[in-house]
């Protein structure tokens, strides 16, 4: 795996964990070079404990949390694009002129193309069209990725950004509704608050269908690193977070498998693999 290169394109610090953290850690441990692009510093995120950050310092704190997670998972380099967190859909943060969703798509595309051509990844990971749960920034990075990948491969596009590079494969990490339901059931069995899961019906309607998952990975060997990465993001995953309600042994069982849908090239048939790099000439 020493010559393999994997690039994650995401919106916020902590996007690198839930659907893919164990996979990133496992590939990194076996020699794959893993890099991450984060378009914002999560300025509009929560602050679980006021002792950890203020609204004014949150971006700086979350950058350090991201770097902690990167060290934990084996990510060799993180690029922050510096756009502002757009916040949840319908909030005032959406209107900020510096918000990522208000950025110039052509500018973002060019910046991503430059990174792709420099790093020359064999696999790119990014959000599916709904962005997991409809976050505007998640949807934006999905759209910008699908624009940047063919642009990076086009030798006529912006020669000043480096030599053209055709990315062999793009995947969407998928957080299955079934995984969240399992977590809910285990929390209910312990008499814990499960109100967080009330919006699952919306995920069922807009989320990624199970029959279009192409790679299933058992991350039992690196699920501890994944859970440790959650703890790096202390401002987002405080004691009240649903990801800290179950004992670690149970959470390790719930999150043991990670799922990926192949976006580029579109697979001709449904097929379940175990390796994102399968059959890619390296």
PLM feature segments, named:
Residues 1-120, 150, 261-262, 269-272:
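Active-site rim/loop-helix segments in enzyme catalytic domains that contact anionic ligands
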Residues 1-7, 93-94, 98, 102-282:
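Metal-dependent de-N-acetylase/amidase catalytic core
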């Amino acid at each position: 795996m020493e010559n393999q290169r994997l690039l994650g394109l995401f919106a916020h610090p902590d996007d690198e964990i839930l659907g893919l953290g164990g996979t990133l850690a496992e590939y990194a441990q076996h020699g794959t070079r893993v890099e991450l692009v984060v378009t914002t510093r999560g300025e509009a995120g929560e602050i679980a404990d006021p002792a950890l950050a203020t609204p004014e310092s949150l971006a700086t704190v979350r950058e350090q949390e991201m770097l902690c997670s990167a060290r934990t998972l084996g990510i060799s380099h993180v690029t922050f694009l510096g756009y502002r967190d757009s916040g949840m859909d319908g909030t005032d943060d959406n209107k900020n002129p510096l918000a990522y969703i208000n950025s110039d798509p052509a500018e973002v595309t060019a910046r991503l193309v430059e990174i792709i051509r420099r790093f020359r990844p064999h696999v790119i990971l990014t959000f599916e069209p709904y962005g997991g749960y409809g976050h505007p920034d998640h949807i934006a990075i999905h759209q910008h990725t699908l624009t940047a990948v063919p642009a990076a491969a086009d030798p006529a596009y912006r020669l000043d950004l480096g030599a053209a590079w055709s990315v062999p494969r793009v995947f969407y990490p998928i957080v299955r509704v079934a995984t969240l339901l399992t977590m809910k059931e285990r929390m209910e069995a312990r008499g814990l608050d499960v109100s967080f899961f009330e919006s699952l019906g919306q995920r069922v309607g807009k989320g990624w269908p199970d029959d279009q998952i192409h790679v299933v990975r058992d991350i039992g060997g690196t699920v501890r690193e994944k859970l440790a990465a959650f703890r790096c993001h202390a401002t987002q995953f405080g004691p009240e977070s649903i990801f800290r309600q179950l004992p670690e042994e149970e959470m390790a069982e719930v999150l043991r498998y990670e799922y990926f849908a192949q976006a580029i090239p579109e697979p001709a048939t449904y097929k379940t693999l175990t390796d994102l790099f399968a059959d890619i000439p390296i």
